[in-house]
Amino acid sequence: VKGSNLRIKVKLTLEEIANGVEKKVKVKRKVQASGVTYRSCPTCNGSGQIMKVANTILGRMQTATTCHTCSGSGQILDQKPAGADAQGMLLEDDTVSIKIPAGVVDGMQLKVAGKGNEAPGTNSIPGDLIVAIEEIEHESLKREGENLHYDLYISFAEAALGVSKEIDTVSGKVRIKLEEGIQSGKILRLKGKGIPSLNSYGNGDLLVHVNVWTPKTLNKEQKQFFEKMLTDENFIPKPEKSDKSFF
């Protein structure tokens, strides 16, 4: 007889998912009490099943049903230690180490064999611990499969002059250089800076979405500055094919 499975949730950061992690979790498991003994079930003679014979129009039919006395284990309690329940079991606190591979997905279930509840009886085997993965939302990175997305906001001046910016990745901060004249909506692809593939080699990419931030309020001098730009040929939009959004 196999013991029942236990189910828990483990919350992981995007960095832990990207790099893989070992987690120690505390669980309450049913275990056989120390000193407990079992003997063969007298109802089923240790088979765990009750054979029934019925007369039908086709002749005598034999069927097997689970023994109600031992619940199919073939054994019943002989010596019950103090504190144990009617099946000789105790509820015990246990710490389980779980190795979580890189690239797991929110909602995925991992199995830790033999770390579930034990079952009564000398020939029983413990159930499994089922671990459900729960991904913690990242402050600045959004996951899409193995790729990651990052929204980078820059000013008009930074877009016109070019700028070096520090951005978040799952392996730490990196600095990227934006060329002068970069357009809002431009997507920069950082190869291999995404999430590792769980079942194959390689990593996804990090897609940096460039957004030119427009100020909502301007003082008098700033308004005059931008009004001059309205008639400047260099500030009249002349989008090239590579600048246009793909919609």
Residue ranges and their predicted role:
Residues 50-52, 76:
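Intrinsically disordered, low-complexity, compositionally biased regions/tails
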Residues 55-62:
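Short linker/helix segments within small regulatory modules
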Residues 35-38, 61, 123:
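Non-catalytic, surface-exposed connector residues within folded enzymatic/regulatory domains
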Residues 38-41, 47, 64-67, 73:
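Residues immediately within or flanking Cys/His clusters that coordinate Zn2+
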Residues 27-43, 52:
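Single-stranded RNA-binding surfaces
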Residues 46-49, 159:
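Short connector loops/turns at beta-strand edges and beta->alpha or beta->beta junctions
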Residues 2-30, 65-68, 75-247:
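Charged, often glycine-enriched C-terminal and inter-domain segments
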